[in-house]
Amino acid sequence: MKKLLSVMVTILFTSAAASAIDLTSPAFKNNEKIPVKYSCDGENTSPALNFNNIPAGTKQLVLTMHDPDVPKTLLPSGNFDHWFVWDIPANSKGIPEGGGAKMGMNGTGKPGYIGPCPPDRQHRYFFRLYAVDIPLQGKMFKDRAALEDAIKGHILAQSELIGLFDKAKKSGQ
């Protein structure tokens, strides 16, 4: 029994380690300030992102960025979609600054990236990278929720990078 339990624990930890994706940015570290350059006060261009440890069997990568700290008086859901990208090749090592693949409509109703621009205080910006086992070529998604619904049950691994931004303090200057 002890041997069986030991084997099961080893398999569990080996599987978890194999499915861990690294998502980083040369522009900022996890839970640190996003530089002004990438905001509405700067060039409003997307930061470079790096990917590592993509699991075997991945058909495509999907990336989302959203702000869950929007005052509910401005947006009842409290979430604002800043960027979502799909059709990223499985062998990709990242997205260059200002780059992307197929990009959906951000919270302003326009396709592409829109940088941090909080109306009140410091907000958190969640970048999420998903490795999926289905191709998404030729598909269009009206919003982040539709994309996330399409990949449910097909996520092999995921990672998260959180950036912070406070417009009033001019982060990253």
Predicted regions: what is each one?
Residues A18-Q173:
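N-terminus-centered regions that define maturation/targeting leaders and the start
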Residues K3-S15:
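Sec-dependent N-terminal signal peptides
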